[in-house]
């Protein structure tokens, strides 16, 4: 079938793509490898974000809690090599050798393999280890294929339903994996990078793609005709949030200035009007789709929209408009904040521009800086911002521990590189340490809620809202369902519609 019209053989998908490489250990590129149906991990997440078997059929923690043993299914890599305990061991060791982020997730001691089992020993007890191994960073690859295949350009040899035929940032062509352990619904798939949301919607309307991921709020109405389109839409487990740089010398180092900034912003209106009710307005650090007392935390949330109080807080912090230009100043310097954003997601520029307009009303100047997604990570780790917005998964291991640590646990000499903000709170760190060793789910939940309370009471972060997420497909396709977990787009569940 030609790639320009619908065919039973070829699935055509329109996506956003930030990856210019398919090396799963580089940056966050493993996400695309998994989203494209090429890579799989030991563990998969169900619709409530609970770990379930994938390459591993079962797992068990040792009585001393210092190791976990995984039993590996008898399956093959796409090149026909068997997925053995030893192959899994080498793949995880490769991730640790190449990705500093792995070490930040859990402290590996060593790994042993025996037949179809792998035992992972950690330097301290890790309650969420199975979930962590569901992260795309830990896609299981055939390390013996390195050198024969360029993982960067051709993708890794893994176990997913599809293999990479050709890859560029703009377009990826996939073929069915001949060694997949189940039926692969399509012979081919074409993934088109269409970063502009309205262009993505247009491609779906015109029938240039069969499936599109994350259609913008303003375009959803175009796909209401159920005879032509199926809309799969759910509450995501994401936050759109701005990290706030609280480093010494930065204006936001003062908690009163942080509170004033947050209280100057009418998030209800942004989510209801600008984003046409496809977002729940922000507050607590974790979204309402997760079971962490969202309602209780919302009730006690201190920085609700209150521009008059925001002005008062700025005055208390010594910021006054002495020269009548509408911007408050202190020691001869205006209160001017750099807001870094990228345009790959429709809502980010909207939130950035709305922030600029509302903050100005209380005397805060916001300078908007639009950057490419690929430089965002570096800007974040170096702390080169006052506000840095992103659309972020709050559970990266079926549990929010990694997320809560990544941005707000104290970064001691590079111990937590993702926290470039300078945020450091001893009570928060103590709870984080306690959480790391807690295996009881009810107690974990309590600790996490306490951590959230500290974040909101110290105005540590600005959560704009919690997005819904969607996948829309044409009538040529069946079972194109979006999952709460954002790693699964092209799966073996998406099939041609039976006519």
What does each of the following model-derived ranges do?
Residues 14-63, 71, 93, 157, ...:
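N-terminal lobe/hinge region of extracytoplasmic solute-binding protein
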Residues 50, 134-184, 188, 307-308, ...:
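Gly/Pro-rich hinge or "lid" segments in bacterial periplasmic/extracellular proteins
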Residues 57-99, 119, 251-253:
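Aromatic- and charge-enriched surface segment that lines or borders ligand/interaction sites
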Residues 64-67, 103-145:
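Surface-exposed binding/hinge segments that line
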Residues 177-222, 353, 365-367, 372-373:
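Ligand-site clamp/hinge motif
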Residues 265-296, 347-356, 380-499:
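Detector for C-terminal structural segments
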Residues 281-322, 343-350:
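Structural transition elements
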Residues 320-395, 469:
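Ligand/substrate-recognition segments at binding pockets and active sites
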């Amino acid at each position: 079938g030609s790639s320009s019209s619908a065919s039973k053989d070829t699935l055509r998908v329109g996506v956003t793509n930030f990856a210019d490489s398919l090396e799963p250990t580089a940056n966050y590129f493993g996400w695309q490898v998994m989203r494209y149906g090429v890579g799989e991990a030991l563990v998969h997440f169900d619709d409530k974000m609970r770990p379930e078997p994938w390459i591993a059929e079962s797992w068990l923690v040792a009585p001393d809690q210092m190791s976990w043993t995984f039993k590996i299914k008898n399956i093959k890599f796409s090149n026909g090599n068997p997925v053995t305990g030893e192959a899994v061991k080498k793949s995880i060791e490769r991730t640790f050798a190449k990705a500093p982020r792995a070490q930040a997730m859990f402290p590996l001691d060593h790994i042993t393999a025996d037949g179809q089992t792998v035992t992972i020993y950690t330097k301290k007890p890790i309650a969420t280890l199975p979930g962590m191994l569901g992260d795309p960073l830990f896609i299981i690859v055939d390390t013996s294929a390195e050198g024969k295949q360029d993982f960067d350009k051709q993708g890794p040899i893994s176990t997913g339903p599809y293999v990479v035929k050709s890859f560029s940032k703009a377009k990826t062509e996939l073929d069915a994996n001949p060694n997949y352990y189940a039926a692969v619904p399509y012979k081919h798939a074409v993934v088109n990078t269409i970063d502009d949301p309205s262009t993505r919607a247009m491609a779906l309307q015109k029938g240039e793609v069969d499936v599109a991921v994350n259609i913008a709020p303003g375009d959803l109405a175009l796909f209401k005709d159920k005879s032509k389109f199926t809309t799969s839409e759910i509450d995501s487990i994401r936050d759109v949030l701005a990290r706030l740089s609280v480093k010494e010398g930065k204006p936001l180092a003062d908690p009163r200035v942080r509170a004033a900034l947050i209280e100057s912003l009418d998030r209800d209106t942004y989510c209801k009007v600008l984003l046409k009710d496809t977002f729940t307005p922000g507050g607590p650090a974790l979204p309402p789709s997760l079971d962490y007392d969202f309602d209780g935390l919302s009730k006690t949330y201190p920085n609700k929209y209150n521009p008059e109080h925001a002005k008062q807080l700025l005055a208390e912090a010594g910021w006054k408009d002495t020269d009548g230009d509408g911007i408050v100043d202190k020691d001869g310097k205006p209160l001017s904040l750099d807001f870094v954003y990228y345009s790959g997601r429709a809502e980010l520029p909207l939130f950035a521009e709305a922030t600029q307009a509302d903050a100005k009303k209380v005397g805060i100047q916001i300078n908007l800086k639009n950057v490419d997604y690929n430089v965002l990570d570096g800007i974040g780790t170096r702390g080169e911002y006052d506000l840095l917005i992103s659309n972020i998964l709050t559970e990266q291991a079926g549990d929010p521990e990694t997320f809560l640590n990544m941005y707000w646990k104290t970064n001691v000499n590079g111990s937590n590189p993702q926290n470039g903000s300078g945020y450091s709170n001893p009570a928060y760190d103590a709870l984080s340490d306690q959480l790391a060793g807690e295996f009881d789910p009810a107690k974990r939940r309590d600790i996490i809620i306490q951590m959230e309370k500290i974040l909101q009471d110290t105005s540590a972060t600005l959560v704009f809202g919690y997005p819904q997420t969607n996948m829309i497909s044409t009538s040529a396709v069946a079972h194109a369902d979006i999952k709460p977990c954002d790693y699964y787009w092209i799966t073996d569940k998406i099939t041609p519609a039976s006519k």
